[in-house]
């Protein structure tokens, strides 16, 4: 039969090529380059044979394929094994395999050797999955094995027409009974399955026989079941191409995304999504080391790097490395490039960071959005507000490691260490003024801020004077400090500094913004809060005792010691340190003044008595006794009236009279 006739053509090969379907036309021969091509129509017998060739049915191609004889050429050949695999689309995992789409490629020629008993065979398997293997030899010069991944294979469809130079012989696959044996049930199942399946090809390359230089390419013909609700492959490709085109148009349009919560806008979707997470309290990313949560994976990764000490972002200009890319960019701008991309539109100010530009713009607008919840203080940035809140809480987180003095600011602590404990620290003097600074970097900042020429006019806060140098402005404003410019609206109090007026106003309003965190007691001044905290809540506090060098008496306050030292050793009454002693001293002074006044009146009476008006003197003495019963003179004093008269005439003083009374 066909097998014997094909065996005669041992040195010929067949070429499979996709042909366009041409209905209502007969056979037509074309000769080109010595190859005969022929198109035909299907006959009823061929349609019957189509059912028996179910293993070669392809639902993807709807065109006819012809098998044409051509001269053979001697070259290296490669064996291709075609396998048909049945599985559903849900179970398909396209890993390490190449999907071959079905499209026409004229530059590829697939050559099939003359079929023989060992060339084309069928292995019978389960009824549900029928496997077929076809060995195909491809010439290397026509198509290299390395390009097989993109090779497009066309499955045999229906009957195959085999033509020779002398005669035309139609060979049906159904007639090759020696090569293919199909059971009727398997044919029906496969025909039904192929109508609802999509055919995919997968190519695998492996070495051939050790004795030959052949490479075996395994081509898997996979039938994938299509879902009813899914579109066809052509529709899917069209929709995909359309969506890709629309995405490109959208991308080219560069639309702007606006936040509905705030005024944020961005031209990038990723930046907009990242911003929207700031308005939600959701933090799904958890650090496994400290259990801190973060909004994004990037923030979590940067945080974990702080635990591990990893610094993945390295500077190309120096040896420094950083945890985040933002720190690296900021470092390069400050140290290497000196770039200041953020510029103010109202003046010539430029900054390395956007946050500093925002803070600077508030100096033009006067905006102070960060308000203290305990007083009227407001700041342009959060850092100064946090620093201000320490004045209410009394917190001093920075401690000097030498004398253990605590400070609210790190800068104040550094200056303290340099000035108080830096004996051998070099000093830098400003060439424009008498300022001496411990650090060279601070000297540069001082000269830039105070002595640099400013194109903008700097106006005095107290008058209409204008300057172009900040140092000159400060020196001018000091001339206004001797004035008591701040006057109280409620009384006649006036002061030189605004902070003094603020503290005074609290005496009228009753405001006590400084609260003790331990006992909730409130104070008008911060100094009173600090003294209260040290005295009652600090276990390590040792009160300072101020001792008098003359009498050795101790005082808790220096002012009390100063008052005492003025009177100590003069024979006068010694002042007490406590509040009770002060009240007693004031009461005694009041009594002494009243006694002095009464004594003057008594002296006047005695003078009148010395002149012969005895009755007037007794009346004056009686009046004085009624006013000050505790200071009544004894009767014996009347005997010394003449002597007192002489002393009064000589200009007696009150102190002399009191000394006389003591005697």
Curated annotation (Swiss-Prot):
* Expression sites by tissue: Testis specific. Specifically expressed in primary spermatocytes.
Keyword list (alphabetical) reads: Activator, Cell cycle, Chromatin regulator, Cytoplasm, DNA-binding, Metal-binding, Nucleus, Repeat, Repressor, Transcription, Transcription regulation, Zinc, Zinc-finger
Q: Which InterPro entries match?
A: Znf_C2H2_sf, Znf_C2H2_type
Q: Which GO molecular function entries does the Swiss-Prot or TrEMBL record give?
A: chromatin insulator sequence binding; DNA binding; DNA-binding transcription activator activity, RNA polymerase II-specific; histone binding; RNA polymerase II cis-regulatory region sequence-specific DNA binding; sequence-specific DNA binding; transcription cis-regulatory region binding; zinc ion binding
Bias-annotated ranges (Basic and acidic residues) = 24-51, 594-607
Q: What GO biological process term is on the record, naming one? A: positive regulation of DNA-templated transcription
Basic residues: bias regions: 580-590
Q: Where is it localised?
A: Cytoplasm; Nucleus
Describe the protein's quaternary organization and the partners it interacts with.
Interacts with histones, PRMT7 and SETD1A. Interacts (via N-terminus) with BAG6/BAT3.
Which family would the database say this protein is a member of? Belongs to the CTCF zinc-finger protein family.
What name goes with this protein?
Transcriptional repressor CTCFL
Q: Which organism is it from?
A: Homo sapiens
Q: What is the lineage of its organism?
A: Eukaryota, Metazoa, Chordata, Craniata, Vertebrata
The gene coding this protein: CTCFL
